């Protein structure tokens, strides 16, 4: 199977790198803008799961495993769905730009997922989802004065 180009979403936040790193690695912070994670530890080998909703309200159990952690720089985890073939990888990379932080999210391997009737695993859906999550959810969270 030909591997598609990864999805890449980049945004610069008016927030220090420590705040952005905590937002993507602390489960209590993540619940405020990302998904409702029961547990999360930024440690290689740590497995976590959460439910996400499909286009028609279907619940998909996401199964993830932390692959790589470079504190305040990089976080990679696998991303797959319970009961479906395929595996993908999500990477968050952080770059300090003065008192701002540039985040680069890449998601690769999503083409290994099956085609569903509602195209829940289509590249366009992932792009739309990540654009909202990174461009709106995370931005609003880290740029708030007190959270």
What are the functions of these language-model segments?
Residues 1-13, 17, 95-106, 139-140:
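Aromatic-glycine hotspot motif
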Residues 102, 109-147:
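A conserved amphipathic terminal alpha-helix motif
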Residues 4-5, 44, 58, 86:
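Residue-level preference for beta-strand/loop junctions
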């Amino acid at each position: 199977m030909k591997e598609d180009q990864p999805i890449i979403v980049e945004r610069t936040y008016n927030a220090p790198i420590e705040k952005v790193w905590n937002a993507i690695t602390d489960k209590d912070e993540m619940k405020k803008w990302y998904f409702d994670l029961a547990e999360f530890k930024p440690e290689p080998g740590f497995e976590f799961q959460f439910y996400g909703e499909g286009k028609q309200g279907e619940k998909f159990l996401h199964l993830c495993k932390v692959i790589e952690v470079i504190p305040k720089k990089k976080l990679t985890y696998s991303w797959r769905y319970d009961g479906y073939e395929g595996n993908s990888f999500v990477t968050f990379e952080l770059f300090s730009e003065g008192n701002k932080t540039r985040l680069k999210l890449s998601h690769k391997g999503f083409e290994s997922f099956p085609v569903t009737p509602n195209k829940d695993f289509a590249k366009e859906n992932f792009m739309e989802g990540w654009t909202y999550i990174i461009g709106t959810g995370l931005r609003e969270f880290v740029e708030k004065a007190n959270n």
